[in-house]
Amino acid sequence: MEAIPVLAGPTGSGKTFLALRLGEEVPVEVVSADATMVYRGLDIGTDKPTPEERARVPHHLVDVLEPHEAMSVARFLALAEEAIAHVLSRGKLPLVVGGTGYYIRALSEGLHDLPPPDPGVQEALWAELEARGLEALLAELARASPEDARRVGKNPRRLVRALEVLRRTGTPPARFPKRPPRFRYKKLVLWPDRAWLFPRLEERAKAQFARGLVEEVRGLLERYPRMPTALQAIGYKEVAGHLLGAYGLEEALERDIRAVKAYAKRQYTWFRHEPGDVVYLPRGGEEAYVGFRDWLRLHFGL
């Protein structure tokens, strides 16, 4: 089977823009690999394509869950592979687009076949995380499996899941057998200079506040006062803290900007070690379109 194209890169590098522009020229359908765009109602803070844009260029795995529903890597993998197969069955080309590196890695490299989650153990671990802190629990995981510790990084949800598996089974996740990937992939990773990206991240955050992010989060908190995982996303968490009285609006914006820059740094680190058939394009946004099209012509005849 021919490979599936993947467009990856740090947040704000222009992935959605490039995919939408490509869709004006080529009959592609986007399969989103974004951990927050799956949620309905999280629109402004995720820079989600509008309904009009998605009507022009079909998107899969966007607006498929309510904010209180959990999205695991295993669930993403099942939904994404199903969407890719569906697009291929209709003679169209799926284009995987996103910056959630662990999702993309699971697609291209396979996923460890772990036991189903145990909500009771996870709840206890969340309480322990609150009491002991992330570093203490991460050190526990690192003693058992440095590979798993590197993989979960500073992500508390992945840390809780890894420790849950370890404590229940005595075996760290990395030692479980892997399910092989269903498709082959070729990846293009946008790699703009940080001096180009970071000012754009600041301007995007300010624009999101101006477009009504605070009102969007207020509405979500009214529906979900217990702050589900979806509302821990960058931007939403910082605005929620403001709305719950922890700090002012200006500080919420400053926290948002710091958080999104830190996330972009982690994405650079992650994608720097991306395995498989990978090309890095040292551009972002509109400047990257020519290189993106050249890559598609070379490898996919588009």
Swiss-Prot record:
It comes from the Bacteria. It catalyses: adenosine(37) in tRNA + dimethylallyl diphosphate = N(6)-dimethylallyladenosine(37) in tRNA + diphosphate. The keyword Endoplasmic reticulum does not apply. Its cofactor is Mg(2+). Substrate binds at T11, G12, S13, G14, K15, T16. The record marks T100 as: Interaction with substrate tRNA. Its EC number is 2.5.1.75. Keywords: ATP-binding, Magnesium, Nucleotide-binding, Transferase, tRNA processing. Belongs to the IPP transferase family. This is tRNA dimethylallyltransferase.
